[in-house]
Amino acid sequence: MASTWAIQAHMDQNEPLEVKIEEEKYTTRQDWDLRKNNTHSREVFRQYFRQFCYQETSGPREALSRLRELCHQWLRPETHTKEQILELLVLEQFLTILPEELQAWVQEQHPESGEEVVTVLEDLERELDEPGEQVSVHTGEQEMFLQEMVPLRKEGEPSMSLQSMKAQPKYESPELESQQEQVLDVETGNEYGNLKQEVSEEMEPHGNTSSKFENDMSKSARCGETREPEEITEEPSACSREDKQPTCDENGVSLTENSDHTEHQRICPGEESYGCDDCGKAFSQHSYLIEHQRIHTGDRPYKCEECGKAFRGRTVLIRHKIIHTGEKPYKCNECGKAFGRWSALNQHQRLHTGEKHYHCNDCGKAFSQKAGLFHHIKIHTRDKPYQCTQCNKSFSRRSILTQHQGVHTGAKPYECNECGKAFVYNSSLVSHQEIHHKEKCYQCKECGKSFSQSGLIQHQRIHTGEKPYKCDVCEKAFIQRTSLTEHQRIHTGERPYKCDKCGKAFTQRSVLTEHQRIHTGERPYKCDECGNAFRGITSLIQHQRIHTGEKPYQCDECGKAFRQRKKTSYKEILLKNHSEPQAGVNLLLSSLIPEWQSCFRKDL
């Protein structure tokens, strides 16, 4: 059972604040100083300060006294300067205003200042903006396309908000702090806290026994192990897999690449540790401590000769240089795709298994990568921070904005390998490729065209003449429900799609999109025969009939054929219904907006 922390502050402020776990007290000054100087202990005091309740005290004087003591132990004015105290307050507020999913990601990096938070978020944004890939995943007879994304949080991982942080010792690699990337993404969660408490209830907290136990447990938990206390030094690592694979010298953790051994040792501490005087973090080697201390000093001695970007560690610089050299030493055995980082390969390989560990709490939708869940959450929050400077449209992801901007520039980066046709959007390419996948297509027996299953059902109504969706006002019928919905706006006068440039409104979104190209000058539909470009697909189809000679519209009276349907004038509507003039008038009025209908009916 997890222990309950209780704080007792004495009226005499000269006496030290006592922290106890259930009935046990840290009575010696040495134990108290050790806890007081710990970074995680400061976080405990901060939480108690923020969550302090007036009802827990006997009166206002005691409440004020306890608040002063808690704040004193949190901010440490005897060791911190005014600037450092201000930075702590700003950092706390900065973390508080972040969205919950970002709070969890940032807290995992344990930032010490607001600048570190900015660095973490900027690095995360760069990783999320990397172009994705399509990975074919076979499950039974189905084939689905997944998007490669950078993971954010594992399923079941607790939300590391400001109110739920645990006071736990942790060994970290400065390289991983700089890179915001963990080779072995494991955590010291509730199992560690509960196990530590079970042992602490059976042991007297004296000497170095507690310290050694914490080091052993930190080492074990870092490698993803959950052991019983008596098995800590006897059982092999829970994460070892194959005898032939390289393993960690400290705890036998299995590694998939020889190069991972160095990576793993940076997060798996040895017996000796080196502590940072500024923040209390501990490291297994002195060189790691030196590199970490550059976070506090701001020193970045390793500079890239190509782009001038500077780094705190040599290893981080070496990894960065891969961007310029294009070297990708880590290759996927399934599809052959190569990566510059082992962690990127590890994330990519999850796509082939089809596993979806990350679930949305709002709708239950599952994702194989944390980044997929991260982007999906924006659907519920309606967050669209990325805006196009050309047309002012907003998007939830920078990558979608980049794709959209191809509409204005004319860039079509997604090309079909089968026929060479190019598209602005990757989704358009995926839809197009279904034409070539015969096993996924449904072919019309009348004309031979291929469609998806739902598309074929709608298409066949063209041949059968079936129009199941009928307008209640004018009794006009349609093949699709969406066509009926758009048509009914003629009678209601509703024009929900308005142009931001000139204020003109339209009944259909597609008509607005085509209209906006008048302002932007965009003509994305190009004729392959003569090179003429058009704003809309309908205009291109009509134009292409000049080259093909197709004339699909025929006159019922004389049999003459035409390339495009002639628009019916109001006069022709009345002439066609000359035998029933009132029916012609009603049909004509039904095509007008309600305001005009009422005006004309008064004159009739």
Curated annotation (Swiss-Prot):
The gene is ZSCAN12. Belongs to the krueppel C2H2-type zinc-finger protein family. The keyword Metal-binding applies. A zinc finger (C2H2-type) spans 274-296, 302-324, 330-352, 358-380, 386-408, 414-436, 442-463, 469-491, 497-519, 525-547, 553-578. It holds the Pfam family zf-C2H2. SUPFAM superfamilies: beta-beta-alpha zinc fingers (SSF57667), Retrovirus capsid dimerization domain-like (SSF47353). GO terms for cellular component: nucleus. Gene3D superfamilies: Classic Zinc Finger, DNA breaking-rejoining enzymes. It comes from Gorilla gorilla gorilla. Residues 201-264 are annotated as: Disordered. There is a cross-link at K20, K25, K196 (Glycyl lysine isopeptide (Lys-Gly) (interchain with G-Cter in SUMO2)). It is found in: Nucleus. Keywords: DNA-binding, Isopeptide bond, Metal-binding, Nucleus, Repeat, Transcription, Transcription regulation, Ubl conjugation, Zinc, Zinc-finger. One of its GO terms (biological process) is regulation of transcription by RNA polymerase II. PANTHER family: ZINC FINGER AND SCAN DOMAIN-CONTAINING (PTHR23226), ZINC FINGER AND SCAN DOMAIN-CONTAINING PROTEIN 23 (PTHR23226:SF76). May be involved in transcriptional regulation. InterPro entries: SCAN_dom (IPR003309), SCAN_sf (IPR038269), Znf_C2H2_sf (IPR036236), Znf_C2H2_type (IPR013087). Residues 46-128 form the SCAN box domain. Residues 213-230 have a biased composition (Basic and acidic residues). PROSITE patterns: SCAN_BOX, ZINC_FINGER_C2H2_1, ZINC_FINGER_C2H2_2. The keyword Secreted does not apply. Its main location: nucleus. This is Zinc finger and SCAN domain-containing protein 12. GO terms for molecular function: DNA-binding transcription factor activity, RNA polymerase II-specific; RNA polymerase II cis-regulatory region sequence-specific DNA binding; zinc ion binding.
